[in-house]
Amino acid sequence: MVSFRTMWSLVVVVVVASLASSGVQGRSVEGSSRMERLLSSGSSSSEPLSFLSQDQSVSKRQVFDQACKGIYDRAIFKKLDRVCEDCYNLYRKPYVATTCRQNCYANSVFRQCLDDLLLIDVLDEYISGVQTVGK
């Protein structure tokens, strides 16, 4: 009769082998490659922080962007900024946070961050916030 320990080892080996062969891929790895492609397609320079050398730089901690001409609502800015902060924490690349905030959050990186942070179910709420601050 097969011992319990041997049977358990066999079950573990089968499960690991089936997961390895099924092509399971982590969401963060897939999202990271999509974010890299998105950021590289929008920039003509190979340097990720090259846009910061323009006349207005945006610090990572700045909540209110003076270029935003819409209604100033601190709660909305904090909510939108939180998406960029969480996206930065997901990818750990400073240019993700700064690019996410460009154009008063009305950009494809912000939209990708919403998708990667699984916030698509409340997308309308965030789009409304972007339209409010960026008019």
Swiss-Prot record:
Molecular-function annotations in GO: neuropeptide hormone activity
Disulfide links within the chain: 68-104, 84-100, 87-113
PROSITE patterns tied to this protein: CHH_MIH_GIH (PS01250)
Tissue expression pattern: Produced by the medulla terminalis X-organ in the eyestalks and transported to the sinus gland where they are stored and released.
Main location: secreted
Leader sequence residues: 1-26
Chain positions with Valine amide modification: 133
Cellular-component GO terms for this entry: extracellular region
Pfam family, one: Crust_neurohorm
InterPro entries: Crust_neurhormone_CS, Crust_neurohorm, Crust_neurohorm_sf, Hyperglycemic, Hyperglycemic1
Localization (cell): Secreted
GO biological process: circadian rhythm; glucose metabolic process; neuropeptide signaling pathway
This protein's UniProt keywords: Amidation, Carbohydrate metabolism, Cleavage on pair of basic residues, Disulfide bond, Glucose metabolism, Hormone, Neuropeptide, Pyrrolidone carboxylic acid, Secreted, Signal
Modified residues (Pyrrolidone carboxylic acid): 62
Function: Hormone found in the sinus gland of isopods and decapods which controls the blood sugar level. Has a secretagogue action over the amylase released from the midgut gland. May act as a stress hormone and may be involved in the control of molting and reproduction.
Protein family (similarity comment): Belongs to the arthropod CHH/MIH/GIH/VIH hormone family.
Protein name: Crustacean hyperglycemic hormones A
